[in-house]
């Protein structure tokens, strides 16, 4: 049994660390310490060391929880603390159990991590794509359930990753972005309302590109944040080519019609009414007719209508999760 030091206790790293601690016997290793640059002792029932304390330990490997910063952290540990490269590993090098599958990083993995936001609305309504979801996050790449479903639809239902064209992607998901950028036949532009998150700063209600410019526009879990819904959909309609497609999804409650309340103005009220502080509506079963009113032809792919129960469990997808494909 190998002695492991777990490095990195940020948001995702903290969830990974707790899962590893619970399951270390089954995974055939022993965690002797947790390490982070920040002092996090007050948040844990076990000791958290800083890198300078490593010389006091005897260990077999240091496991870095972050895929994004793995190379940077590895080089720093080697440079600053004299740790050999052979002793630094990633989670996928440590665990061989293959219970689940993540199509984002194309790996079979032993566990998924919980994620989501709690709100009283989730005890009253079943909101697909919202709330706390068990076994939702891949511990290797950090991708979540709705991103895995988006990747599946783009790849298996649309053959999207082999196509040519010009693509605008709002609020790009990291693993989806990586896959699209690898296709050199596509002109790919990412956009976000906040600077530093994408190639361009774009307001979906005032897109700066000319008419009929894009073959594809992707925007997942964006429209529920937009107050002027009509302006957003009119801009999507304006910017898409005649034979283009808009690929999008939103949190949705299939039990009710779309719910909006102008008296809901504070973050606390939005959390209670819609399930998240920055949401301005809760989409419902009338979504298809709303889309048609905006002038789109609307089709959708739903997990439970495409995959078997066994397949969706292996990929940890939400049965009712839905990707919409809009055309003119």
Name every feature range the model reports, one short phrase each.
Residues 215-227:
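A short SAM/SAH-binding and catalytic strip from SAM-dependent methyltransferases
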Residues 2-3, 164-169, 241:
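Residues that mark the start of a beta-strand
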Residues 24-31, 184-187, 296-297:
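A generic structural motif
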Residues 81-87, 165, 184-186, 244:
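A short helix->loop->beta-strand "cap" motif at the edges of active sites that frequently abuts
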Residues 205-217:
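A short acidic, Gly/Pro-enriched loop at the edge of an enzyme's catalytic core
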Residues 1-95:
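Hydrophobic, well-ordered beta-alpha structural blocks that scaffold small-molecule cofactor pockets
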Residues 97-100, 107, 227-235, 241, ...:
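S-adenosyl-L-methionine-dependent methyltransferase catalytic module, highlighting the catalytic core
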Residues 93-208, 309-327:
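Conserved N-terminal segment of class I S-adenosyl-L-methionine
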